[in-house]
């Protein structure tokens, strides 16, 4: 190969590298020119009284969580800061068309914008990435950060609540006479008055839904244009979020409603079953466990009571009353004529009147089936007819052994003894017959007393059943109305359609 051809080959191989080498050298020369005598601690103001305008924006990548217990909101964001540093401007034509540079954040002046309402004392960003400097002197810095900001939680309508959490940014080192803050610009470079959602990396929260995300510039008192020394401007970003209540509906409210139904059906359980008290106390203990579980979720505040706690307390009061009223029902059920005498008003109200309204009907006792006496058409001897009438014809029991009147027990009717010891004593029975009739009369009285005792005891049991049914319908009405009143109130608690009406 001739020397000329070798030179041509080397020139062809080195030609693609020449622009890159020249570009690196041009960028290096530009850096040396820009930072020759540059002091990153000096504010980029042409005059002493000039204010540096800093645009503050926020790009939301993820709403990590909202800790109601600690009143803390965790977010993953990109802080979008933009300002103009006249010392970092150049003519692209003089530097091989270089239009922008990426420079480490430590090398340039920074407006020192930090989160004021942080909850962990960390004011810095997570990573000091490089700033992008354009040829006209504009500087843009988008450092990522995980912020834990304080958020005042309103627990009145928990878990059907919405919260208004704020992130307050301000310059920590400069007041409003040195640095002028303004709301950030959108991706298109136009005015942007809300938090920008990073479409590519945004992760939706499973518990909270973002409703509004506006921002607002808070001017210090006085002239908002000129600024005042010692006072700082603030840019506040609002996150108005609404809770997704499905988790609490399935895991808390639905079990509470089922437990309330158990407490209601305690009054449908017969007192003889022996489980009325056990079922009531079981429901009461279950609600107590739910209250203990919710205590770790709700902030410890005395300003208001959450709506779910109101519902649990309402249910607990109902279940407590069900325990007390079950005791009353059992007390009525086990009463007897030997221990309690039924008042007339109790009999009138709970036996004769209330059952009609409660759709209760007391079964009627079956009548004694007695054969009809045979009709003797042919005349017979006097002894035979008397014998037939003695053994076949049965006098009414109320006539021989009258039942005492339950309403007026003092009224009594004559009994069988009037046939034994009449007032005129005209008819005298043989001593053997008198002893037989006296024994029969004693046995009949004992049977009658036992029958009356059982009847009065059944009356008390029927009163207990009527009271049980009355409590059942009362609890159904109170539970339905109370549940609707408590939860319908939450349906009117909605986020405002306009965050700044």
Swiss-Prot record:
Record membrane topology: Multi-pass membrane protein
GO biological process: acetylcholine receptor signaling pathway; behavioral response to nicotine; chemical synaptic transmission; membrane depolarization; monoatomic cation transport; monoatomic ion transmembrane transport; muscle cell development; muscle contraction
Entry-linked SUPFAM superfamilies: Neurotransmitter-gated ion-channel transmembrane pore (SSF90112), Nicotinic receptor ligand binding domain-like (SSF63712)
Compartment(s): Postsynaptic cell membrane; Cell membrane
Modified residues (Phosphotyrosine): 390
Residue intervals annotated with topology Extracellular: 24-244
Disulfide bond residue pairs: 151-165
GO CC annotation: acetylcholine-gated channel complex; neuromuscular junction; neuron projection; plasma membrane; postsynaptic specialization membrane; synapse
Signal peptide (from-to): 1-23
Glycosylated sites: 164
Membrane-spanning parts: 245-269, 277-295, 311-332, 470-488
Any Pfam family matching the protein: Neur_chan_memb
Membrane side Cytoplasmic: residue ranges: 333-469
InterPro entries per the UniProt record, alphabetical: Neur_chan_lig-bd, Neur_chan_lig-bd_sf, Neur_channel, Neuro-gated_channel_TM_sf, Neuro_actylchol_rec, Neurotrans-gated_channel_TM, Neurotransmitter_ion_chnl_CS, Nicotinic_acetylcholine_rcpt
Alphabetical UniProt keywords: Cell membrane, Congenital myasthenic syndrome, Disease variant, Disulfide bond, Glycoprotein, Ion channel, Ion transport, Ligand-gated ion channel, Membrane, Phosphoprotein, Postsynaptic cell membrane, Receptor, Signal, Synapse, Transmembrane, Transmembrane helix, Transport
Reactions the enzyme catalyzes: K(+)(in) = K(+)(out); Na(+)(in) = Na(+)(out)
Molecular function as annotated in GO: acetylcholine binding; acetylcholine-gated monoatomic cation-selective channel activity; channel activity; ligand-gated monoatomic ion channel activity; transmembrane signaling receptor activity; transmitter-gated monoatomic ion channel activity involved in regulation of postsynaptic membrane potential
Gene3D superfamilies reported for this sequence: Neurotransmitter-gated ion-channel ligand-binding domain, Neurotransmitter-gated ion-channel transmembrane domain
Family: Belongs to the ligand-gated ion channel (TC 1.A.9) family. Acetylcholine receptor (TC 1.A.9.1) subfamily. Beta-1/CHRNB1 sub-subfamily.
Associated pathology: Myasthenic syndrome, congenital, 2A, slow-channel: A form of congenital myasthenic syndrome, a group of disorders characterized by failure of neuromuscular transmission, including pre-synaptic, synaptic, and post-synaptic disorders that are not of autoimmune origin. Clinical features are easy fatigability and muscle weakness affecting the axial and limb muscles (with hypotonia in early-onset forms), the ocular muscles (leading to ptosis and ophthalmoplegia), and the facial and bulbar musculature (affecting sucking and swallowing, and leading to dysphonia). Myasthenic syndrome, congenital, 2C, associated with acetylcholine receptor deficiency: A form of congenital myasthenic syndrome, a group of disorders characterized by failure of neuromuscular transmission, including pre-synaptic, synaptic, and post-synaptic disorders that are not of autoimmune origin. Clinical features are easy fatigability and muscle weakness affecting the axial and limb muscles (with hypotonia in early-onset forms), the ocular muscles (leading to ptosis and ophthalmoplegia), and the facial and bulbar musculature (affecting sucking and swallowing, and leading to dysphonia).
Protein name, per record: Acetylcholine receptor subunit beta
Organism, as annotated: Homo sapiens (Human)
Taxonomic lineage: Eukaryota, Metazoa, Chordata, Craniata, Vertebrata
């Amino acid at each position: 190969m001739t020397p000329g051809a070798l030179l041509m080959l080397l020139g062809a191989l080195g030609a693609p590298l020449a622009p890159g080498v020249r570009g690196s050298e041009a960028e290096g020369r530009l850096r040396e020119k820009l930072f020759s005598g540059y002091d990153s601690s000096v504010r980029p103001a042409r005059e002493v009284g000039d204010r540096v305008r800093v645009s503050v924006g926020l790009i939301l990548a993820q709403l990590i969580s909202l800790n109601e217990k600690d009143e803390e909101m965790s977010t993953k964001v990109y802080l979008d800061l933009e300002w103009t540093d006249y010392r970092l401007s150049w003519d692209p034509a003089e530097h091989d068309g270089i239009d922008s540079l990426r420079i480490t954040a430590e090398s340039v002046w920074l407006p020192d914008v930090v989160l004021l309402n942080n909850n962990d004392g960390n004011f810095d960003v997570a990573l000091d990435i490089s700033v992008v400097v354009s040829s006209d002197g504009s500087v843009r810095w988008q450092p990522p950060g995980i912020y834990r900001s304080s958020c005042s939680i309103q627990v009145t309508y928990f878990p059907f609540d919405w919260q208004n959490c704020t992130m307050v940014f301000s310059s920590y080192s400069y007041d409003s006479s040195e640095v002028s803050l303004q709301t950030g610009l959108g991706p298109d470079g136009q005015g942007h008055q809300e938090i920008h959602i990073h479409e590519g990396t945004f992760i939706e929260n499973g518990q909270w839904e973002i409703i509004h995300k506006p921002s607002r510039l808070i001017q210090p008192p006085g002239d908002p244009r000129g600024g005042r020394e010692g006072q700082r401007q603030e840019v506040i970003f609002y996150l108005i979020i609404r809770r997704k209540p499905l988790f609490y509906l399935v895991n808390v409210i639905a079990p509470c409603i089922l437990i309330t139904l158990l407490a209601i059906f305690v009054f449908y359980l017969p007192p003889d079953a022996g489980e009325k008290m056990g079922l009531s106390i079981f429901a009461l203990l279950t609600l107590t466990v739910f209250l203990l579980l919710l205590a770790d979720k709700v902030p410890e505040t005395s300003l208001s009571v959450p709506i779910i706690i109101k519902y649990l307390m309402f249910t607990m009061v109902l279940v407590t009353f069900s325990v007390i009223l079950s005791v009353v029902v059992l007390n009525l059920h086990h009463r007897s004529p030997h221990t309690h005498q039924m008042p007339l008003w109790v009999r009138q109200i709970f036996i004769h009147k209330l059952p009609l309204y409660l759709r209760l009907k007391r079964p009627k006792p079956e009548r004694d089936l007695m054969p009809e006496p045979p009709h003797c058409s042919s005349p017979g001897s006097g002894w035979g007819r008397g014998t037939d009438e003695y053994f076949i014809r049965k006098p009414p029991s109320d006539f021989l052994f009258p039942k005492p009147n339950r309403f007026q027990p003092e009224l009594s009717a004559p009994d069988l003894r009037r046939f034994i010891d009449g007032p005129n004593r005209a008819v005298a029975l043989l001593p053997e017959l008198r002893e037989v009739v006296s024994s029969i009369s004693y046995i009949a009285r004992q049977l009658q007393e036992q029958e009356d005792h059982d009847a009065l005891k059944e009356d008390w049991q029927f009163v207990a059943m009527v009271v049980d049914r009355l409590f059942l319908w009362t609890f159904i009405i109170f539970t339905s109305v109370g549940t609707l009143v408590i939860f319908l109130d939450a349906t009117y608690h909605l986020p405002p359609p306009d965050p700044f009406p």
